Amino acid sequence: MSMVYANIFLAFIMSLMGLLMYRSHLMSSLLCLEGMMLSLFVMMTVTILSNHFTLASMAPIVLLVFAACEAALGLSLLVMVSNTYGTDYVQNLNLLQC
């Protein structure tokens, strides 16, 4: 495994550990999820470019679209929770159930 792959994998693991450790606030969880998606995007792009997979060249773009949709939904949920309760604690999400 080259150093590029090791660094990208380390970035993914650090984002995952951040998501597991700092899950009390919604904003920190969203930032960790974005870090995970960014490292996955870079890993897919580097792998596809280094192995010359021409048929899979659209996969990183699709992943980036899903990451943008996830970020938009997460930010709208963050705005809704912060307007309703005044804080961005994840424990407030259980109160949103009907």
Swiss-Prot record:
Family designation: Belongs to the complex I subunit 4L family.
Annotated keywords: Electron transport, Membrane, Mitochondrion, Mitochondrion inner membrane, NAD, Respiratory chain, Translocase, Transmembrane, Transmembrane helix, Transport, Ubiquinone
Keyword presence, Transmembrane: yes
Transmembrane segments: 1-21, 29-49, 61-81
Protein name according to UniProt: NADH-ubiquinone oxidoreductase chain 4L
EC numbers, comma separated: 7.1.1.2
Membrane topology: Multi-pass membrane protein
GO molecular function, one term: NADH dehydrogenase (ubiquinone) activity
Superkingdom: Eukaryota
Pfam family, one: Oxidored_q2
Role noted for this protein: Core subunit of the mitochondrial membrane respiratory chain NADH dehydrogenase (Complex I) which catalyzes electron transfer from NADH through the respiratory chain, using ubiquinone as an electron acceptor. Part of the enzyme membrane arm which is embedded in the lipid bilayer and involved in proton translocation.
Keyword Membrane assigned: yes
GO biological process: ATP synthesis coupled electron transport
Localization: Mitochondrion inner membrane
GO cellular component: mitochondrial inner membrane; respiratory chain complex I
Substrates-to-products reaction catalysed: a ubiquinone + NADH + 5 H(+)(in) = a ubiquinol + NAD(+) + 4 H(+)(out)
Protein's organism: Cystophora cristata (Hooded seal)
